[in-house]
UniProtKB/Swiss-Prot annotation:
It catalyses: (2R)-2,3-dihydroxy-3-methylbutanoate + NADP(+) = (2S)-2-acetolactate + NADPH + H(+); (2R,3R)-2,3-dihydroxy-3-methylpentanoate + NADP(+) = (S)-2-ethyl-2-hydroxy-3-oxobutanoate + NADPH + H(+). Gene3D superfamilies: 6.10.240.10, NAD(P)-binding Rossmann-like Domain. Binds 2 magnesium ions per subunit. Its cofactor is Mg(2+). Involved in the biosynthesis of branched-chain amino acids (BCAA). Catalyzes an alkyl-migration followed by a ketol-acid reduction of (S)-2-acetolactate (S2AL) to yield (R)-2,3-dihydroxy-isovalerate. In the isomerase reaction, S2AL is rearranged via a Mg-dependent methyl migration to produce 3-hydroxy-3-methyl-2-ketobutyrate (HMKB). In the reductase reaction, this 2-ketoacid undergoes a metal-dependent reduction by NADPH to yield (R)-2,3-dihydroxy-isovalerate. The lineage of its organism: Bacteria, Bacillati, Bacillota, Bacilli, Lactobacillales. This is Ketol-acid reductoisomerase (NADP(+)). Residues 183-328 form the KARI C-terminal knotted domain. Keywords: Amino-acid biosynthesis, Branched-chain amino acid biosynthesis, Magnesium, Metal-binding, NADP, Oxidoreductase. It comes from Streptococcus pneumoniae (strain Hungary19A-6). Residues 3-182 form the KARI N-terminal Rossmann domain. Mg(2+) 2 binds at D191, E227, E231.
Length: 340
């Protein structure tokens, strides 16, 4: 199925005009949505628990409230807290303060699609999901364009939910470069699959396996790091800019020939079957339930995974090599952290 890209000219209704907007959470996506909407002339307040995000929102000039207060004041409530805390946040502080005719939005369909959050039938439920991290959503807006976004409607109580979703996307700058309509099911399942099988899980496992093959064969860890990790950005940038075609036009004939000959030996039909199993666990809710249950138990699995990953040899080698490469950029964890 193909979908048609939409732009600012296709946003026919200024559905957010006269609406009080509450952005719940002021982390990676929250600060970007809030600041872009404010700069687009919208009436935005912040709802967040006390802490660094609360202080930062006030410092940035927003009227900042508790989540309960912000929900009571708002017509449109966008929940941009981390996925794992949204259910308890919604049930304790948002749901009791919703009114008929309100709209509730998300930037990812996780909690709605898997029914961890159930919104009353008299409230709209929409989505605006920019295809990029918050700092990029903000920076590109300030530069005069934006990041493409997906939009969706899960529940249309007022008949205006699609207009709200599209106008929100316009307000954050996404309609300048393109909007795609989707569903909560499609966005959630595709997003999780992309993260797990390719962009995060698949990629890091591939890099680590390549590093281990080289070092176990007696090659220097530092050289292995450059070959399987450091040069990854160069290749990904070419694919990002012009697809496989541009990448293959830009590399040597030797590298291109090796691409065709050896790629299928690594990513075999069995790997594809494994990917299908990953997708099945997403579709049937197994991954979602495992993730949420781990959070409710205090994150024992996630903590163990993080500790294991931090002790990988490739991480230790990379940390030392990057000290001599200031051109790779400052390692600023706070720039990407989601608080509260």
């Amino acid at each position: 199925m193909t979908v048609q890209m939409e732009y600012e000219k296709d946003v026919k209704v200024a559905a957010l005009d006269g609406k009080k907007i509450a952005v719940i959470g002021y982390g990676s996506q929250g600060h970007a949505h809030a600041q872009n909407l404010r700069d687009s002339g919208r009436d935005v307040i912040i709802g967040v628990r006390p802490g660094k995000s609360f202080d930062k929102a006030k410092e940035d000039g927003f009227d900042t409230y508790t989540v309960v207060e912000a929900t009571k004041l708002a017509d449109v409530i966008m929940i941009l807290a981390p996925d794992e805390i949204q259910q308890e946040l919604y049930e304790a502080e948002i749901a009791p303060n919703l009114e008929a005719g309100n709209a509730v939005g998300f930037a990812h369909g996780f909690n709605i699609h898997f029914e961890f959050i159930k919104v009353p039938a008299d409230v709209d439920v929409f989505m605006c999901a920019p295809k990029g991290p918050g700092h990029l959503v903000r920076r590109t807006y300030e530069e005069g364009f934006g990041v493409p976004a997906l939009y969706a409607v899960y529940q249309d109580a007022t008949g205006n939910a699609k207009n709200i979703a599209m106008d929100w996307c316009k307000g954050v700058g996404a309609a300048r470069v393109g909007l795609l309509e989707t569903t909560y099911k499609e966005e959630t399942e595709e997003d999780l699959f992309g993260e797990q099988a390719v962009l995060c899980g698949g990629l890091t496992a591939l890099i680590e396996a390549g590093f281990e093959v080289l070092t176990e064969a007696g090659y220097a860890p530092e050289l292995a790091y450059f070959e399987v990790l450091h040069e990854m950005k160069l290749i990904v940038d070419l694919i990002y800019e012009g697809g496989f075609k541009k990448m293959r036009q830009s590399i040597s004939n030797t590298a291109e020939y090796g691409d065709y000959v050896s790629g299928p030996r690594v990513i075999t039909e069995q790997v594809k079957e494994n990917m299908k199993a990953v997708l099945a666990d997403i579709q049937n809710g197994k991954f979602a339930n495992d993730f949420v249950n781990d959070y409710k138990a205090g994150r024992p699995k996630l903590t163990a995974y993080r500790e294991q990953a931090a002790n990988l040899e490739i991480e230790k080698v990379g940390a030392e090599l990057r000290k001599a490469m200031p051109f790779v950029g400052k390692n600023d964890d706070d720039a990407f952290k989601i608080y509260n």
